[in-house]
Amino acid sequence: MASSASRFIKCVTVGDGAVGKTCMLICYTSNKFPTDYIPTVFDNFSANVVVDSTTVNLGLWDTAGQEDYNRLRPLSYRGADVFVLAFSLVSRASYENIMKKWIPELQHYAPGVPIVLVGTKLDLREDKHYLLDHPGMIPVTTAQGEELRKQIGAAYYIECSSKTQQNVKGVFDAAIKVVIQPPTKQREKKKKKSRQGCSMMNMFRGRKMSCFKS
């Protein structure tokens, strides 16, 4: 058990400002929705977490999505094991910025790090009062979120609500799983590269043998 607990996973949340990243982190770590003061950035948090009988030390890093933090934000990416990339289900602009802004930024500063795509504020997507107060706003559908996951190559797509706590734990369970149990495609790629390496070695060996024979 001690050796399992020593496995450290750095999880960094990324996405536009005001999509609910900080609320999601507070909800996950305190099991309650913040109703008073909500900080711009959540303090770094670390705790032992058990997922699928495996204990890991999960470190959570929050980032500010506003342009004012564009220079400082990438400093948090160093050493990241997984990114939780969030957009609001009731903000199409934040959804579109996943491809426009966040994927290019992550590919530049942290290429190859797995991503869990998250649609936040799930409770508001079906809230009739909220929709009436925001005429013309078209929520992001589950199908559109799943399509975006495929486009960016994210390991998971999860919709959650910090206010109701729906699926919040599932977001970070998925982030842990993608590190300790990489998706099948990633494992297959590694095996394929290994097989290709072996076949190349065998090919070179064959050429050497034929040279010696002649």
Curated annotation (Swiss-Prot):
Functional summary from the UniProt entry: Inactive GDP-bound Rho GTPases reside in the cytosol, are found in a complex with Rho GDP-dissociation inhibitors (Rho GDIs), and are released from the GDI protein in order to translocate to membranes upon activation.
InterPro entries membership: P-loop_NTPase (IPR027417), Small_GTP-bd (IPR005225), Small_GTPase (IPR001806), Small_GTPase_Rho (IPR003578)
Transmembrane segments: none
Membrane topology: Peripheral membrane protein
Cellular compartments annotated: Cytoplasm; Membrane
Any one GO BP annotation for this protein: actin filament organization
Organism: Oryza sativa subsp. japonica (Rice)
Similarity comment: family membership: Belongs to the small GTPase superfamily. Rho family.
Post-translational modification as stated in the protein's UniProt record: May be palmitoylated.
Binding-site residues, GTP: 15-22, 62-66, 120-123
This protein's GO CC annotations: cell projection; cytoplasmic vesicle; cytoskeleton; plasma membrane
Molecular function GO terms recorded: GTP binding; GTPase activity; protein kinase binding
Predominant location: cytoplasm
Keywords of the record: Cytoplasm, GTP-binding, Lipoprotein, Membrane, Nucleotide-binding, Palmitate
Protein name: Rac-like GTP-binding protein 3
Motif placement: Effector region: 37-45
